[in-house]
């Protein structure tokens, strides 16, 4: 076991590539002339969610035959969607709150309908707690397309996607290798970080019809795309999913949002052996002396490339990751050792805290070695400090469980000297939380469940929520306001529309604000504002633990801050694929019902209702209905 001395500065930052704080009005393919606006290809909201309260009004699950949580879930799908063809997705697990999470994928003629899912949440009592459903119910294709093979070949699909989205991928001289009956890999291409693939699948369209498509996967760095090209017409792209959502350690310790909030400290062995039993500097096979271990691998990436294994990373004698840094140092490369160390530290603390709250191996977390605890390994987070592929941003790519996540932290040029995103914890926590939400929502095997506009907005909001919750100080009250990204952006207003506040005069956002918003960061600000209200309601009821880790009593955090973080995380795993605000709210209420028997029902309802997501709120992508009503028992 490594004995380390850490110099720390508190960081509270948080593949699906998700970009961080940059205020913008559209989501485009990053950094290239002629980039296409991906909002035109977003997946539509199709999911329904049957909450615990609604389940009580339906025929009892007791009529189902007794069995395991998998058998109960399967029986529910059979009875709810009779005569439907589906398969069990191999990422089911029982979370640390005792809920069995089971997911099914609809199929047609043995071919997946890629956006048709059914998730079932089975409670500790063996009965269904809730479920989500986006199964396709329209007419089935008359014949199996594999019989006549009346569809374009995959190379045509790749070229069609390349042209339609203006991708920097070249396929001249490339050839196709079969991976399975419905999936191929393209060998000999250039312009992508890994070999593109194509999988034949159906897509349920917004108009209620079904399209046979090639799902073409291309990782081009700042975008990691799943593009659904029509299998009959090589110029028609139906939808696009982007996986990217743009020793001793001398660091800013956990809880410090940026260099303005405190000084750097030297920390010795800062890991938690309950959540990182191999420490941060080993993977069970190798003990490392650089910023590399089971949870993450951090390095300098000035050219923005993908060859991270051979990039520079600090490797000090005696494991003393102690390097000079001050915000006045310039150019940034002069303090790269401190930058990589800080990024490595903050991301590992994220891993450990989220593990305690339920994001473990079974739930699809990021680790090389899962030590036989479930899930798929070989997927630490690749952490690129001072990444040269961009500026004034950060992003995180979340592929399914078993493939490494990738975070890129950029230099911000809004100040002189420039500022390094590695030193703003809120940015790093926000990005890491994209990995959390994309693995939990839809299950570890499906990173495509936060791509509808409101769903993607919640992905941004969760990142801000965890970054803000970690940042709370001992003397903070519900009157305390916080901005997001103020330091890196060199702006007291930060990078969001409003500060996070419980004061309607400071932050007036409500649910119907979304009717005028069409960008995920803006919608995420509305969602985080609601969660901030819930957070303070729970803190006012249960108090606030200002320590770096939660204290549990019978599996429940004993304070309001960590309880809010736990309930929000549990809600991510309960909700359906591509949820809307109403469904995500109900999932948090169901998480509380499971964890505390609904002891916090009214605090949660009042927080949401204050911001227009009360009992009567209704989702319509073009005309949402707000409500300030709470259940009668909460009045």
Swiss-Prot record:
Q: What is its EC number?
A: 3.4.24.-
Q: Which sites bind Zn(2+)? A: 430, 434
Note how many cofactor molecules are bound and how: Binds 1 zinc ion per subunit.
Question: What InterPro entries does the record point to?
Answer: FTP_domain, Fungal_virulence_M36, Peptidase_M36, Peptidase_M4/M1_CTD_sf
GO biological process terms on file: proteolysis
Give the highest taxon in the source lineage. Eukaryota
What is the active site of this protein?
Answer: 431
Pfam families, per database record:
FTP (PF07504), Peptidase_M36 (PF02128)
Q: What does the record give as cofactor?
A: Zn(2+)
SUPFAM superfamilies in the record: Metalloproteases ('zincins'), catalytic domain
Q: Which residues form the propeptide?
A: 20-246
Task: Enumerate the UniProt keywords alphabetically.
Answer: Glycoprotein, Hydrolase, Metal-binding, Metalloprotease, Protease, Secreted, Signal, Virulence, Zinc, Zymogen
Cellular location of this protein?
Answer: Secreted
Q: What class of enzyme is it?
A: hydrolase
Q: Which family does it belong to?
A: Belongs to the peptidase M36 family.
Q: What does this protein do?
A: Secreted metalloproteinase probably acting as a virulence factor.
This one is known as Extracellular metalloproteinase 1
